[in-house]
Amino acid sequence: MNLFFLFIIPTILAVKPFRSFNNISLIDNGNVESVRAVVIDYCDIRHPNNLCKKHFEIDSYWNDDTDCFTNIGCKVYGGFDIIGGHTPKVGTVCRLKKGENKFGYCNSKGNCVERDFKESFGISIKIKGISNKGDDEPACPQYKNTWINYGKCNEPYYCGTNHGLFYANKRKLDYFPTDGEKCNSNNIPYAVCYLGRCHTTGGFFSEFGTIVKNVEIVTLSDGKNSSRRGKHKNLPTSKVFDSYSIYDIDPKNWKIEDDDKDVTVHENTLDPKSDSRLC
């Protein structure tokens, strides 16, 4: 009997849910309309990178989004919450000052610093998912006052160090690089800031899915697996973009389908690949 209790009690304790984040509101009722949330990773606590899934949920946020060294929440595959991680990666979006809707990014010293949009890691698009493979460069808008917000790619490889702190901001749409408006001659509304340059959505950012105009909630995909919204479907003969090599496809070869349920991006593999990264 003693052996039974020695086994069963630790088992029960191991799966007991932590409720610390569950009832926290995601809505910031400040002077700027915004949503504050961490993209939650589903993974195996024994080896966080082992069973990480493609889909993440927004159901908690940093307990202090001005602190670049704060712990962040992580939802484990079993369905309960833990507090995991300690050092968000350089580039995580952070709030510059408590009570103010001004954002920057965490630098290598752990400070939240302000930069203009071209050089920073950006205000991020309101999304409900991201792949477990990403890049730290943000999407940059092509035109002023575009309706959709902006995206930040992340690398949530480990439970507790998934760096997806996202903000949706519909009012303050003025974080634009001056050369971003003339970057894309094909009128594709979004591009990615990469190595100080503004690149078209058909380029590097396509690895993570394409942000489509007039879609409020999208998800980003790694090009191999589709998520709930903002699907990026690669045809069998297409080249899958990866983090190590940049393959570029002219944005005019992308077809957007929006049935108000899914946004699917199809690659036209009949057209030759072209390098549009230099705009």
Swiss-Prot record:
Cellular component terms (Gene Ontology): extracellular region
Residues making up the signal peptide according to the UniProt record: 1-14
Domain of life: Eukaryota
Propeptide: 15-27
Molecular function terms from GO: toxin activity
Protein modification: Contains several disulfide bonds.
Xref: InterPro entries: Neurotoxin_TxP-I (IPR016329)
UniProt-annotated location(s): Secreted
Predominant subcellular localization, coarse grouping: secreted
Tissues in which the UniProt entry reports expression: Posterior glands which appear to be connected with the stylet through a series of ducts.
Keywords assigned by UniProt, alphabetized: Disulfide bond, Neurotoxin, Secreted, Signal, Toxin
Cited function: Part of a complex mixture of neurotoxins which P.tritici utilizes to capture prey. It has contracting-paralyzing activity in insects.
Name under which the protein is recorded: Toxin TxP-I
Species, as recorded: Pyemotes tritici
